[in-house]
Amino acid sequence: MKRIFVQNRELVVPGTLLAQGPYKNGRGTFREGSRIYSTVIGLVDIKGNTIRVIPLEGPYIPEVGDNVIGKIVDVKFSSWVVDIGAPYLANLKIQDFTDEKIDLLRTDLRKFFDIGDIIYGKVKAITEVNNIDLTTKGMPFNGGPLKGGQIVKITPSRVPRVIGRGGSMINMIKKLTMTRIIVGQNGWIWVNGKNEALEKLAIEAILKIDRESHTKGLTDRIKSLLLSRLQELKEKGVIEEIPELEEEPQEETEVNNNDGETRRT
């Protein structure tokens, strides 16, 4: 018998029966025979045949394929050490950064990424001893470094709420605040605005979503907040016009694109 007993993004508690049959159990779950149960309080995340539960609280627990924002904390001979907010530091090897042949004896890797730089990568592999390997190949901006802006850190389980259904929430924030935003699935968000006031407004909206993620009518409240603040900025002469939204965003219930990536629209 093959059956899923819960909905994607459903809040579950430890011991909740999630699925039965040939599904793969991910983080936050355990298997007993053919049945998969939750081990934590969190949100169900279903990707293909894999079922995991994202804890409501606690550090980011990486999964292969996650797009993450990280900070370079050390530069080694042939790799970089990256903080992605997980219990363990991640590694970015030179071969996962570029296909170009690099003479490591003559090249200082700090010319590419230095300590303190912010990068955008994908979790490539996780070993049994929790070694986390990243790759920046094929990522927007070639993985970075991401210049300017600020890093906002939210609870990882609330990332889908920030993104919204089909990107509705984050695209609304980007459109109205005229900012560049990249959302990492580790809960780190890069925000780069045209000016300080717009950047702060985008951050205010994101943090409000983080605080109120499990409440109804959040999309309307975020829209109201943004329009109210923008009207104030217009009256002060900070901006000339308030951008118009092409479509009314719908209240988000799930994330269709699981990569957590957003770009300027």
Curated annotation (Swiss-Prot):
Ranges for domain KH: 147-205
GO biological process, one term: poly(A)-dependent snoRNA 3'-end processing
Region (Disordered): 241-265
Main location, first listed in the record: cytoplasm
Annotated S1 motif domain residues: 65-137
One Pfam family in the UniProt entry: ECR1_N_2
Keyword list, A-Z: Cytoplasm, Exosome, RNA-binding
GO cellular component: cytoplasm; exosome (RNase complex)
Subunit (UniProt): Component of the archaeal exosome complex. Forms a trimer of Rrp4 and/or Csl4 subunits. The trimer associates with a hexameric ring-like arrangement composed of 3 Rrp41-Rrp42 heterodimers.
PANTHER family: EXOSOME COMPLEX COMPONENT RRP4 (PTHR21321:SF4), PNAS-3 RELATED (PTHR21321)
Protein name as annotated: Exosome complex component Rrp4
Gene name, Swiss-Prot/TrEMBL: rrp4
